[in-house]
């Protein structure tokens, strides 16, 4: 007697998933074989039915299908809708396995014993699949399809009846290509064959026409419209029956697959094998990688000459040290201990030498207190501004310390290159007697100029800041002749207002100012030369400073003159020729035009600074 799944779990037909889970746990604890050691066989059978019932009812689709076909599954005989009409009976050779007959095998109680016996799981399911395969081949032959004559599925079903299921399976393994559908096999069937079986049967499709499902009898006496309507309804019934049959076969395949322990064990073994193969593959790859790396390193690495040890020389050294040590020690025990000690010491020294090979060289900058890993990094650091500033600061500090301690002669400051080396050579090559004679001549010239120009000395000494042309003449042998054709605006205004008398007074004052300034600048130049000669031994920086100041003065003077040349005159010059006369700065000769003065300067070589004439400062009386 078949048992309903709901009755087996003791739940209602509308029970929820949570209720089904609780009922399954309760029944499993009650009928599990481990909980019933006195009645293991019966407990195993009941527990298998409980597990099958829970697997069907826990799946929503399987549960819906079970509810709709529950009466057909629980009945011992297939339900035939044509039982009421005894006049029409369908031949079983035409229909084959029907949907109603297949429904009877959805009961898990039929598969309680998982063995190769006739009442076991493998033979019951295997015979059902063989019957379905036979029907498909017979329908293919009936329809005259190509290739179906070569299929041996019909013979396999006959071999089961004549030889038995196990022998039929063994004999058909050699001719699996002649079968339309793979066989189900038994307990020793391989996992690969099972995968092929379930793959093929999961895509099952039938060739049956299901004409026995027609609702109306077709007759030629019907008119065309009636015939068309009858054919339409009969085709609809056939399609519905065919679809139901295909779904039933696929569901039966899934039902058997859940109960098949071979698939579970085979999947587990396949997973373990796959992991083992993956592990072995990785190990082989690692081994090959290590071998390849070792081969590459061995091919690239060569011992240097200093890394190799001459064994003969090493043995000779050991013998020499052993002899020396034996001479020092008389006691034999001490000799043995010392002998071992020397050997160990030599070995440790040898190991330490090999360990020293792997030392890392670090490059330090002691000025900036930084470390570098390569010489190139240190060279790049030396070129940076930060290092140069720190180096200048350290040099200045060292110079100050040496000067404070009186260690100028001992300092290494002379090792550094100086920009004033040529100037130092010039002064060092001069004779002191020549210098004294030159100084006496300069003093005589200053005395004569002071006597001649003392009468014209006035209170305009405050306006002598920019008159440095005479210093240029004394300090440089090459004269820089500068000619300015422009007339200052202040001079133009003075000429227009004061007239000829004021212009003469202005020229006199300019000459006086230039003479006074020249005397002071001569004295300043003499004192500067003497001071530079005295300090040339202790410091060289003064020469560079003087040259820089000298070049800066020239640059500023050139810029001022350029700006004056670019500045346009605000008012035109309206002075008379008699009021403004050009005077030579050397011989004091007067000329009526500037061109005459320039020609005189070029022929006679009388060059004097024209800054006083250009600036045209006003006298205190006019102010």
Curated annotation (Swiss-Prot):
ZnF locations on chain (C2H2-type): 363-387
A GO cellular component entry from the record: cytoplasm
Biased composition (Basic residues): 553-564, 612-623
SMART domains referenced in this protein's UniProt entry, alphabetically: DnaJ, ZnF_C2H2
Biased composition (Basic and acidic residues): 525-538
Chain ranges of the J domain: 4-70
Region described as Disordered: spans on this chain: 448-476, 499-581, 599-623
Official protein name in the record: Negative regulator of PDR1-mediated fluconazole resistance JJJ1
